[in-house]
Structure formats: structure tokens, C-alpha cells
């Protein structure tokens, strides 16, 4: 099969890296050849695959060597669980330079060194936060990733980020082949969460490709720097990631999304009872200004 390049986006702290690493571990279990490219200065996109605190990054090693041209592929590419190939782009020191530049440098380096020509089935880009700048949007902008998956939850800001990312996809979809593959709901146990994300996906013209329930086994595995697939392969949560992997392998629904307005998003939250219409009357009011509090 032809190599598929996928990027995982989502609100910061939503669980992108954990979801991505468990997903690729499940893909490896299916016999797929996979590479993860971490596009985050924290360099935590591969730690569960490599059982390490953080992988040495391309930007760090380039700084030590002099320039990125002084590096060889074997210097930066490591192999972990399930023969998954791992690369971290890295970034500058906090407060110095553009972290998005590290993503651009890393992807260009991997292409120049023919890293993608090793009979790979999948490349996954695990990307920092929202589409915050041109550097982090590179997998979309430069047509590196054809499939975008957004990790979200039933929380308003996670849904807001998913909608924003969809806007970024639309911006570049007409000039390239980038498409939205679906929303991955990484549950936060909010009310009617699966229904809400399915409704959001429908408004975006896409799908909720899988609902990943919340389970403490994920944290237990992370403490050991392992995926659930490796740590406890018999766990129900491991089967959830296996199901997600199979759905992505079989996914044919790749669309140019139809983002919605903030008003439409709030209306959706009201429809599902997450936000009450009356709440709009208390926006900007302090506790002292609210009658309910004044009477206490």
C-alpha cells in the first residue's frame, strides 16, 4: 500500500501525544510499518514508544553539530516498540526564536535524507496545540500530511480548537490534497460527550472516527513510559486503541471540512444542555453583582 501521511492536531493538553503513541502501537501490532515525527519542542511525542524521558531532537543535535547538514539520519532516527521509527523535531530554548521553525527544519531534513523511502505504511506528525503559526501548520500547508485527525473532547475549548483547525485545513485544501479524516474524542467524561462530538463532526461534514473512553490504565502505563498496548495488552483500553487503528486503516471519508461560527458552536452546546441560554445574561458579572450571590 502507498504510504499514508497523517497529522494529529488538537487543543494543548487534550492527549494528542498519548493517543498518537497508543494508536501507532496498535498499528504496529497489525503489522504496519510506522514512523512518528514529533512536532513539539517538548519532545514528548515518542517517549512511550522509546521508554525514555525525551528523545534527542533534530534541533538540539544540529546546534551541537553546527548545522543540520552535519547530521546523518541515524543520528536522529530511533527505533522503539513494534519497530516504530521515532523522530523529534524539537525547537529553540524557551523565549528564543520560532519553535515552528523546528518543524520545517525537521521535515525538510527527513525528506533530504530519504527517511520516507523505507517501505513505510504510515507517517504520523504529532503537532503542538492548535494551528498557532505557519511552522506548526507546515504538515497542512506544505501538503506533507494528506489526512488530518483532530483529538478533542466535549469541553468547549477543545471543540473550539477542532473548529479552528478545520479552518486551517480549508485554507490549504483547495491548493493541495489535505483533508480532514475525522475527530477522535478523547473522553473527559463530560455530559453527552459522544453525542456532542458526533454532532460537531456532522456539522463539519466529517465523522467522529472513534470515542476513546477515559481509563486510569492510560496513566499507569504512562508512569512506566509505555503505551497501554505494551503495558497491558489484555486491557479494555488497549482494545479501544486497536479499534481506532483499524478504523483509520479502513477510513475512506476524507473531506474538506465546513467550519462553523462561534455562535453556531455555542448553539450546539445549548442544544445539548452544556450551556444554558440564561448563562448569557451573567457574562461579565462578578459574584457580588449576581442576585443569587447577593441574597446568600
Swiss-Prot record:
Belongs to the NifH/BchL/ChlL family. This is Nitrogenase iron protein. Its EC number is 1.18.6.1. It comes from Alcaligenes faecalis. It catalyses: N2 + 8 reduced [2Fe-2S]-[ferredoxin] + 16 ATP + 16 H2O = H2 + 8 oxidized [2Fe-2S]-[ferredoxin] + 2 NH4(+) + 16 ADP + 16 phosphate + 6 H(+). Its cofactor is [4Fe-4S] cluster. CDD domains: NifH (cd02040). The lineage of its organism: Bacteria, Pseudomonadati, Pseudomonadota, Betaproteobacteria, Burkholderiales. Signal peptide: none annotated.
